[in-house]
Swiss-Prot record:
Residues 49-139 form the ATP-cone domain. InterPro entries: ATP-cone_dom (IPR005144), NrdR-like_N (IPR055173), RNR_NrdR-like (IPR003796). Its cofactor is Zn(2+). It comes from Leptothrix cholodnii (strain ATCC 51168 / LMG 8142 / SP-6) (Leptothrix discophora (strain SP-6)). PANTHER family: TRANSCRIPTIONAL REPRESSOR NRDR. The keyword Isomerase does not apply. Binds 1 zinc ion. Negatively regulates transcription of bacterial ribonucleotide reductase nrd genes and operons by binding to NrdR-boxes. Pfam families: ATP-cone (PF03477), Zn_ribbon_NrdR (PF22811). Keywords: ATP-binding, DNA-binding, Metal-binding, Nucleotide-binding, Repressor, Transcription, Transcription regulation, Zinc, Zinc-finger. This is Transcriptional repressor NrdR.
Length: 147
């Protein structure tokens, strides 16, 4: 497993247990190069609904794209990787258990916004400003008033 901090491929498993939700194996790992610890989750591969973009294109659900967008919104915010991973797992679970064969990016985006609102209000506003394509300061003000 590649270290997300330094890119080293030599890591060791420090602890293994079932996730709180019971749908994954949670592993705490330590990098042999930088000595930092990180968490990974091992899950059964499931057939997720196709994601329908605004222009009608269909794509496979991409967990890493979800992680990247949430991580960008949470950049320089004090939110642990474990909390981010748990939020991503909740979103994935909602997408999978919806039973739908397709899901719009707008529906997934709303799920992301709910999770970010729980994790960090600043990240929520950051994500919403891009996701909802804010054009002016009034849109920011309105969203902040809703919080």
């Amino acid at each position: 497993m590649r270290c997300p901090y330094c890119g080293n491929v030599e890591t060791t498993v420090v602890e293994t247990r079932e996730s709180d939700e019971g749908d994954a194996v949670r592993r705490r790992r330590r990098c042999s190069a930088c000595d930092k610890r990180f968490t990974t989750y091992e899950r059964a591969e499931l057939a997720m609904p196709a994601v329908v973009k605004k222009n009608g294109d269909r794509r496979e659900f991409d967990r890493e794209k979800l992680r990247a967008s949430m991580t960008l919104a949470l950049r320089k915010r004090n939110v642990s990787v474990d909390l981010i991973d748990a939020a991503i797992a909740r979103i994935e679970d909602k997408v999978f258990t919806s039973g739908a064969s397709e899901m719009s990016t707008s529906r997934i985006g709303e799920m992301v916004m709910r999770e970010l609102k729980r994790l960090d209000k600043v990240a929520y506003v950051r994500f919403a400003s891009v996701y909802r394509e804010f054009e002016d300061i009034d849109a920011f003000s309105k969203l902040i008033q809703e919080i």
